[in-house]
From Swiss-Prot:
Binding of heme b, residues: 63, 92
Domain Globin: 2-146
Descriptive protein name: Hemoglobin subunit beta-2
GO MF, one annotated term: heme binding
Family: Belongs to the globin family.
Amino acid sequence: VHWSAEEKQLITSLWAKVDVPEVGAATLGKMMVMYPWTQRFFAHFGNLSGPSALCGNPQVRAHGKKVLTSFGEALKHLDNVKETFAKLSELHFDKLHVDPENFKLLGNVLIIVLAGHHGKEFTPSTHASFQKLVNVVAHALARRYH
């Protein structure tokens, strides 16, 4: 994947302002609200009975932070995202049996959350750059499935 200097700048400049624990929790919680079948991977997290329970669940919040922290690794390795996520791809395929479509869903929810948190700063160019990034990350995570 080729990244232009502008794309890299847009991504890194917005990411520097992202509250990873908050955005991670919001993203994972909203994904489970919007796509309830994804909750089956997190049944051991306790109360997932509705939007308030999901978004306030400490385990959802902690895992959301972990997911977004991992996503942040992609920014450090934009030219080698596949290798960066090779072990996570294996884990999600071999042990967790996650449908790779869920990676795309999570990426799309992240875009929505970022847009909501950053308003006018989340310009069409920034949106396009992040959409490209979440697609690259989703593809890298699905790599082991191919």
